[in-house]
């Protein structure tokens, strides 16, 4: 087994000349996310590259990459037009022929969202509650809870706006939500601020759909994500649904469907 | 400890004898024999015919296995059988045989999950410790990762299994079922060059194959490639201006493989990224396919990992894997009392409590 350190594939063309060079933030199964700049050095931007997959037949690979990056960009453009908080699309190349060897990968350049990932906000909050060890007075405790409720409503609000625009996210977790705030550098042991707009990111699995089933599954995925990553905050999930109701008129039908989705057991047993 | 494993969840009847030495030496395969029920071209295997085949052969195979392994009945500790999942009638006939042996010889029974059998045998043969497992066969398609005493299913097929998709397309083309329809498709696909457009259906971590089968069947009909009496020589492609002509049977097999295997590699890669594993283990009958192994190898290499696969002795359904998984469970004290020695068509991989791993 080779133990070579992983080297990301070469950057596609205009980005080979960027100074400073884009910095790799995360590597998923599908895409690499870089932080780079747009037009001038003061405007940061997020660059998502979908490298070509050498295991796939080249025709199939090009077809899938093109389909997916366009799908993502179309969803984002539509949502920006509808006024939903998502990063704006700045540029994209679905052919990905710009690399040194002609296959650097299709890319999508997006507006940079400054802020904290909601997962981190909740993690810090849970750490803060744990560290305070019940020393908080009733009034402070209520204030803390009120903050969480507010953020939860904000999350519900943005998800409602998304569904109102006819888009399904497909992978709603707290890692794909950013709290746009100036207050990024909070010291450990302090309760994080929870004010600011909630912005949805990563539309890699998104699609346009008007079925209530898809919307209900979207909410269910989010609910499960809270259950598994933020057990402390899970009890306020009702607030997400409240925020959702406020921002989306068709919420009643979706929430009714959500009941059914929750009641469904595990997937049916699979044979032949 | 010595265990006999009986497997008959589909058209293969397998008997294996496994030895786990008491001094902690590596386990030894004492015997691993198989007899396959092969149906004529254009047909699948029906449960009743398959069950009849298993009933007719099981005693012969057990006798032969004992002889090959040079063990006597006294040496055997337990009798392991496939409890499920699989086809009802074949499972039943093998379960009856296992019960009969248990009563006749006074040995304990151990009911084994077929999927867990595949995983444990793959781990034993390849020595890979904690891989993401892709289990692909005629009846199952699952991406599995181990976590706290369960083999958890990360993604799976939403309808038919990948092997079923290949087998049924072999039926459409009237390709021989001997030694296996999937093997013959693989050989034919090596001659294919032109990639035809087929649906690509990955939904999150799950895959769907029935629509692809319908699409490729439709193409075979459109181009008159289905049915009897066609072979590869009779249809030569006539390329048009773009170099794309009427696809051949080989092209369809090639395109089908490329499409469905890409889907499998994609979901496996997602599971690897999610659990942070660098090893992949491919098990199940379709796991013999060298193109699938190759594609998985390229993906794993790009992630700085490696792929493990076994050959047809252990990939295709066999008795030894049932003995292996059964013996692991037996050594932790697991027993299947006679009254519970039933079998079931539906038995989820994550229903099994894996007591023998940390």
Swiss-Prot record, chain A:
Subcellular localization, as worded in the UniProt entry: Cytoplasm; Nucleus; Chromosome, Telomere
Principal subcellular localization: cytoplasm
Record-listed ATP binding positions: 25-33, 48
Reaction(s) the record says it catalyses: L-seryl-[protein] + ATP = O-phospho-L-seryl-[protein] + ADP + H(+); L-threonyl-[protein] + ATP = O-phospho-L-threonyl-[protein] + ADP + H(+)
Pfam families: Kdo
Catalytic site positions: 171
Source organism superkingdom: Eukaryota
Region called Disordered, residue ranges: 1-22
Domain Protein kinase positions: 19-272
Keywords: Activator, ATP-binding, Chromosome, Cytoplasm, Hydrolase, Kinase, Nucleotide-binding, Nucleus, Phosphoprotein, Serine/threonine-protein kinase, Telomere, Transcription, Transcription regulation, Transferase, tRNA processing
EC numbers on record: 3.6.-.-, 2.7.11.1
SUPFAM superfamilies: Protein kinase-like (PK-like) (SSF56112)
GO terms for MF: ATP binding; hydrolase activity; protein serine kinase activity; protein serine/threonine kinase activity
GO annotations of cellular component type: chromosome, telomeric region; cytosol; EKC/KEOPS complex; nucleus
Cross-referenced InterPro entries: Bud32 (IPR022495), Kinase-like_dom_sf (IPR011009), Prot_kinase_dom (IPR000719), Tyr_kinase_AS (IPR008266)
GO biological process: tRNA processing; tRNA threonylcarbamoyladenosine metabolic process
Record function comment: Component of the EKC/KEOPS complex that is required for the formation of a threonylcarbamoyl group on adenosine at position 37 (t(6)A37) in tRNAs that read codons beginning with adenine. The complex is probably involved in the transfer of the threonylcarbamoyl moiety of threonylcarbamoyl-AMP (TC-AMP) to the N6 group of A37. BUD32 has ATPase activity in the context of the EKC/KEOPS complex and likely plays a supporting role to the catalytic subunit KAE1. The EKC/KEOPS complex also promotes both telomere uncapping and telomere elongation.
PANTHER family: EKC_KEOPS COMPLEX SUBUNIT TP53RK, NON-SPECIFIC SERINE/THREONINE PROTEIN KINASE
Domain remark in the UniProt entry: This protein is considered an atypical serine/threonine kinase, because it lacks the conventional structural elements necessary for the substrate recognition as well as a lysine residue that in all other serine/threonine kinases participates in the catalytic event. BUD32 has protein kinase activity in vitro, but in the context of the EKC/KEOPS complex, the catalytic subunit KAE1 switches the activity of BUD32 from kinase into ATPase.
NCBIfam families listed in its UniProt record: arch_bud32 (TIGR03724)
Subunit structure: Component of the EKC/KEOPS complex composed of at least bud32, cgi121, gon7, kae1 and pcc1; the whole complex dimerizes.
Homology family: Belongs to the protein kinase superfamily. BUD32 family.
Record-given protein name: EKC/KEOPS complex subunit bud32
Organism: Aspergillus oryzae (strain ATCC 42149 / RIB 40) (Yellow koji mold)
Lineage, opening ranks: Eukaryota, Fungi, Dikarya, Ascomycota, Pezizomycotina
Swiss-Prot record, chain B:
InterPro entries listed in its UniProt record: ATPase_NBD, Gcp-like_dom, KAE1/TsaD, Kae1_archaea_euk
Protein EC: 2.3.1.234
One Gene Ontology cellular component: EKC/KEOPS complex
A Pfam family annotated for this UniProt entry: TsaD
Keywords in alphabetical order: Activator, Acyltransferase, Cytoplasm, Metal-binding, Nucleus, Transcription, Transcription regulation, Transferase, tRNA processing
Textual note on the cofactor: Binds 1 divalent metal cation per subunit.
Keyword Kinase included in the entry's annotation: no
A biological process from GO: telomere maintenance via recombination
Any one GO MF annotation of this record: nucleotidase activity
Binding positions for a divalent metal cation per the UniProt entry: 114, 118, 135, 317
Top EC class, one word: transferase
Catalytic activity reported: L-threonylcarbamoyladenylate + adenosine(37) in tRNA = N(6)-L-threonylcarbamoyladenosine(37) in tRNA + AMP + H(+)
Protein's UniProt keywords contain tRNA processing: yes
Binding site for substrate: 135-139, 167, 182, 186, 289
Cofactor: a divalent metal cation
Location(s) in or outside the cell: Cytoplasm; Nucleus
Superkingdom: Eukaryota
Family under the similarity heading: Belongs to the KAE1 / TsaD family.
Function: Component of the EKC/KEOPS complex that is required for the formation of a threonylcarbamoyl group on adenosine at position 37 (t(6)A37) in tRNAs that read codons beginning with adenine. The complex is probably involved in the transfer of the threonylcarbamoyl moiety of threonylcarbamoyl-AMP (TC-AMP) to the N6 group of A37. Kae1 likely plays a direct catalytic role in this reaction, but requires other protein(s) of the complex to fulfill this activity. The EKC/KEOPS complex also promotes both telomere uncapping and telomere elongation.
Protein's recorded name: tRNA N6-adenosine threonylcarbamoyltransferase
Species per Swiss-Prot/TrEMBL record: Aspergillus oryzae (strain ATCC 42149 / RIB 40)
């Amino acid at each position: 087994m080779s133990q070579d350190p992983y080297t990301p594939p070469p950057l596609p063309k205009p980005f080979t000349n960027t100074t400073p060079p884009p910095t790799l933030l995360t590597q998923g199964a599908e895409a690499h996310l870089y932080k780079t700049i747009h037009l001038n050095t003061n405007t940061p931007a997020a660059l998502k590259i979908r490298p070509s997959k050498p295991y796939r037949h080249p025709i199939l690979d090009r077809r899938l990459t093109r389909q997916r990056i366009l799908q993502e960009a179309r969803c984002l453009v539509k949502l920006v037009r509808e006024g939903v908080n998502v990063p704006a699309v700045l540029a994209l190349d679905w052919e990905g022929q710009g690399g040194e060897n002609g296959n650097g990968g299709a890319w999508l350049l997006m507006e940079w969202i400054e802020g904290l990932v909601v997962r981190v906000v909740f993690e810090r909050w849970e750490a803060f509650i744990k560290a305070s060890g019940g020393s908080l007075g009733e009034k402070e405790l209520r204030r803390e809870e009120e903050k969480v409720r507010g953020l939860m409503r904000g999350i519900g609000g943005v998800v409602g706006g998304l569904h109102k625009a006819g888009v399904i996210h497909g992978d709603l977790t707290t890692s794909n939500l950013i709290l746009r705030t100036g207050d990024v550098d909070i010291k450990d042991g302090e309760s994080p601020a929870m004010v600011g707009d909630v912005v949805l990111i990563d539309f890699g699995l998104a699609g346009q759909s008007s079925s209530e089933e898809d919307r209900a599954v979207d909410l269910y995925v989010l609910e499960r994500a809270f259950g598994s990553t933020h057990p402390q905050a899970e009890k306020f999930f009702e607030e997400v649904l409240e925020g959702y109701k406020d921002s989306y008129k068709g919420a009643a039908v979706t929430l009714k469907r959500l009941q059914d989705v929750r009641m469904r057991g595990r997937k049916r047993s699979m044979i032949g | 400890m010595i265990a006999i494993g009986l497997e008959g969840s589909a058209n293969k009847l397998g008997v294996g004898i496994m030895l786990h030495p008491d001094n902690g030496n590596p386990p030894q395969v004492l015997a691993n024999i198989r007899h396959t029920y092969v149906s004529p071209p254009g047909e699948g295997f029906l449960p009743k015919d398959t069950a009849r085949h298993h009933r007719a052969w099981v005693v012969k195979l057990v006798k032969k296995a004992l002889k090959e392994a040079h063990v006597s009945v006294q040496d055997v500790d337990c009798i392991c059988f496939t409890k499920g999942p699989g086809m009802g009638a074949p499972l039943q006939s093998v379960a009856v045989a296992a019960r009969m042996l248990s009563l006749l010889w006074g040995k304990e029974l151990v009911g084994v999950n077929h999927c867990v059998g595949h995983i444990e045998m793959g781990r034993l043969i390849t020595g890979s410790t904690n891989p993401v497992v892709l289990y692909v066969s005629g009846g199952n398609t699952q991406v599995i990762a181990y976590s706290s005493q369960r083999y958890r299913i990360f993604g799976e097929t939403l309808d038919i299994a990948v092997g079923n998709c290949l087998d049924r397309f072999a039926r459409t083309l009237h390709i021989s079922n001997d030694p296996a329809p999937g093997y013959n498709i693989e050989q034919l696909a090596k001659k294919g060059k032109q990639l035809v457009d087929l649906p690509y259906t990955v939904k999150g971590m799950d895959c769907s194959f029935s629509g692809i089968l319908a699409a490729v069947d439709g193409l075979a009909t459109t181009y008159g490639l289905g049915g009897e009496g066609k072979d590869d020589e009779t249809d030569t492609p006539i390329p048009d201006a773009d170099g794309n002509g009427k696809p051949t049977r080989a092209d369809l097999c090639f395109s089908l493989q490329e499409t469905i295997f890409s889907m499998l590699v994609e979901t496996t890669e997602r599971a690897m990224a999610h659990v942070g594993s660098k090893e992949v283990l491919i098990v199940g009958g379709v796991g013999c396919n060298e193109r699938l192994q190759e594609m998985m190898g390229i993906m794993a290499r790009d992630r700085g990992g490696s792929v493990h696969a076994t050959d047809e002795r252990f990939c295709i359904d066999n008795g030894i894997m049932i003995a292996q998984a059964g013996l692991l469970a037996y050594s932790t004290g697991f027993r299947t009392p006679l009254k519970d020695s039933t079998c079931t068509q539906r038995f989820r991989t994550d229903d099994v409590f894996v007591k023998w791993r940390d």
